[in-house]
Amino acid sequence: MPRAEEETENMTVKKITPVLFVEDVEPCVKFWMDRLGFEKTVEVPEGNKLGFAILQKGNVELMYQSYVSADKDSAATSQAAGKGPTLLYVEVENLNEIIRAIKGAEVVAPVRETFYGTREISVKDPGGHIVTFAQFVGAQH
């Protein structure tokens, strides 16, 4: 049986982007743009609201889609949108800068040092998803 790396050596994965499903896309876009400097690169209206948006900063990208938009998209998308909140784990260079930027956000896990060498904080975004910001303080992984 061929090894997986031989079978996939010509298969290039360009990126993986999470899609977060929410009731209201606008406050989530505002959170990432106003607090963390992301840029909205794509927006798709859904009636008089935003149904979908892509946010980007450098080579980091995430997408938000409203439940209403997901229901109209496809059966698979609609089904995925019905599952609880997602946790995003975001590695950063300077956690103190992030803490200043997210001041006022709902903290779900205060700053802590982990056994795996990070200093991290977890907050809830306006859509209810958990975002953990982590800075490696020991040897890099």
Language model feature labels by segment:
Residues 2-19, 39-91, 97-124, 135-141:
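Vicinal oxygen chelate
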